[in-house]
């Protein structure tokens, strides 16, 4: 048993699930300065808070989400599959204003905290709300699409947005959308950009046989759809 440091907040409960080691029945956890510093079983040394039959687990991680959709009352219509769903997403995004999106993101952050989520990888397409000290850890991944070569102005716009998010206190990264919505040249350029600045990346991959057909042959239903954009 590791003894907690002085001035440590100790919490006892029925079960503690450290994830990296076996569960602790009748366990306790010590926290100093917002950091877990000790774990043990039985009665903790010194004062403690007893949560009785509760279970303590590490905060949940939502590694890939789109908080901008948090204000939807119900999911978008999925009839017709992914090829029909994508145009609905595009149409909805074009109808919204930045203030509505920021409100949706704020709502999503609040709901995440209420559900025990402490780290989020959010795909970002527009303005972002001001960071609060109570927010979970958020990695803002700037989404990029484009089959035609990315212009210097688009690259600069992306860099400006990332710099703004970084200065606001967010960790940032890049999200090349998907193989069917971004050319190989653009994907390579974005990977180089992310590597140069030590940024994380996220990408939609393996979303069905039609994606595989398009990436291998540059033909099929995906090609027909993309010709409209």
Where are the regions that the model predicts?
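General structural feature for long, well-ordered alpha-helical segments within catalytic domains
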Residues: 35, 97, 104, 108-109, ...
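Active-site gating loops and adjacent loop-to-helix segments of metal-dependent hydrolytic enzymes
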Residues: 71-103, 139-142, 208-229
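Divalent metal-coordination and catalytic microenvironments
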Residues: 14, 29, 34, 53, ...
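A broadly conserved amphipathic alpha-helix scaffold signal in soluble, globular proteins
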Residues: 102-114, 118, 163, 188-195
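Catalytic pocket of metal/acid-base enzymes, prominently hydrolases
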Residues: 67-88, 111-120, 124-143, 201-203, ...
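N-terminal metal-binding scaffold of metallo-dependent hydrolase/deaminase domains
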Residues: 1-45, 55
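Metal-coordinating catalytic core of metallo-dependent amide/deamination hydrolases
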Residues: 126-229
